[in-house]
């Protein structure tokens, strides 16, 4: 643990078995479950825990695998976004039911390791259009062992992005530093009596790793001034001069409690494992432009998996049957108890009466006799709305996904024949409600509209009834099924040729149903050095996108609401987008080529190339959900990646792992996540106003990336000490130029043609020492406290403008509106919207019993 144990001398190369050992490049037996026809990285927990990771969970370090990058949604592979991966726990699906991102977060102390595949699939593999991440949990040990860890961590306050010249907000929100403390206790060992009775070896593994954290948030309220009385706010056309009104603050108390309980029985060729793993957590989120009671919403989540697995391993036969149940629940409540039972008011002004903030109301009252700036509004709400009263919309989400999987592999001479199948059914239920039973909206003083949910019937005719309801309940269901047949032919111990066909079914509700997804997959690998110490491989594979249940709000149903202002009524039945006739599933074709060599347990080198083409992207257009494009411009994504890595161990107490990659991703379809829009559930804005200028480098175009991980062991003053570091640098994302028009967001210039955002670099450092069996560590994340922009505001103008087809950045100075005047550039254009996370320091201790 933590890399302070003495390293044994290099030994002779043994059979590579499953191919996971450092001195192995591939499994030596074609009967093994792992696919050798692509780029897979085995990240042992014993290795990850030697790096500066503090109390990280597995979803935070999956991007350490070769071929991986990272976007705002998670680790990204092969040009895909961070919500296109498949996440599994010991082979059982554990993706988030709503979006497809990681759901059950597993502490590294619970893991045996992470098996990450960046590309290259065989018919047996459950895959989508991204990567696959399998978290392999700790098993029992021959003797009773207890591993105890504790960390205390402080993350500095993040820097607020700069505000645009001339912009104003009534209240601005800032986040303070975040102290947190984590403890982890993991016990493993044998279970004597049951194992003896059943004639085998029984074992257990159990762990708990609670984290307690607190974060301070503060609001600064200010008003405009007009000291010279000229009717123009002071400071314009530059930064506004503001007069402070008040500062308010709150502090959250957040927690996370992951827990694991496992038992297993090994009896001859039979292996049975029963697993319960999950997490209970609490967190808060806040609005900026709101009174304190109306600003906060608390989230209480519970996520977990129950997994039962039987494996049979005979000399010529491997079999597996696995049943699993994934559950998640997210309950929202008002952060302030006083905001739980009253309606929220969203207004285009600051009300003159605010029971929860009378000081702000008085300072912003333009009708007050004490108003010091009578010719300008004190507190204009220029964009969005000001929230007061209750907490507003609260949504509870509960999801369940039972699944069953079966696999059989049989050796027949030089062939290994595999057959198998899987079935997953997801139910996602949402319950939405407004505090106080309604949400009030006002565009002007004296005008008020009440928004409520309804069930049954409703019309815009006030004389007709409308069945108002206190809450709206919706249920979304998805079904995924697959079956495969695969043949691996090994004409010699060093060569294996694989061919297979996978059939998949993907249904989302009653209208979006793909039942004939056929995926041929081919692969060949050659071990020129023998013994599993090398491999050359090539593969071709087709995959189809896994569609999450959250897509139901796009294609099944949304909440039904109506607005009533006393004189008129407007209802929204919550109709989803119509699924286009003849819609095709998202299909991806992939080719990989690579070489890997592992020598004497001290050196491993990998060279890898990957090409992917996504066709039939799914997205919303005007009132319809389908495959956008008119035939000439279709929704596609094309990726090419080349990567190289080198790992060295046991060389003068030094371990080094380094990698470099270059990638290109172009097309018209960004996928279900976009840095500007977030997770959009395939109803983004790209295709709403046409396809002009959509083709170009996509946000997942990774450019150049490099990383170095290193560890050095030694002795200092009688102590075993070590220094470990991880350095990473990568190109910024491609930059586009957009416009906000009455038709929606349009691309003024070809996508990604305005250069790239700044390079992102980060250095992490760990110092550790061991004394009398106790290991102390100091981790520094983002050592140099770099705060470079991660994303910029790409909206150039908010005006009636049209795309400059095939234009360049220099053409923007000539941009005009439909009315013939020059377009006005927004002062927020190219200002940072997100910065790198700040420096974080963690002190840890570890003890093995």
Task: Tell what function each PLM region has.
Residues 2-139, 169, 184-192:
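Periplasmic N-terminal accessory/gating domains of Gram-negative outer-membrane beta-barrel systems
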Residues 494, 606-740, 844-846:
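Gram-negative outer-membrane beta-barrel transporters
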Residues 194-195, 202, 269-274, 282, ...:
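Repeated loop/turn-to-beta-strand initiation elements of outer-membrane beta-barrel proteins
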Residues 175-283, 298-320, 520:
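Transmembrane beta-barrel wall of Gram-negative outer-membrane proteins
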Residues 374-385, 472, 523-630, 635, ...:
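Solvent-exposed loop/turn elements at secondary-structure boundaries
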Residues 148-156, 204-212, 274-280, 321-327, ...:
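Transmembrane beta-barrel strands of outer-membrane/channel proteins
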Residues 717-720, 726-742, 768-849:
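C-terminal beta-signal and adjacent terminal beta-strands/loops
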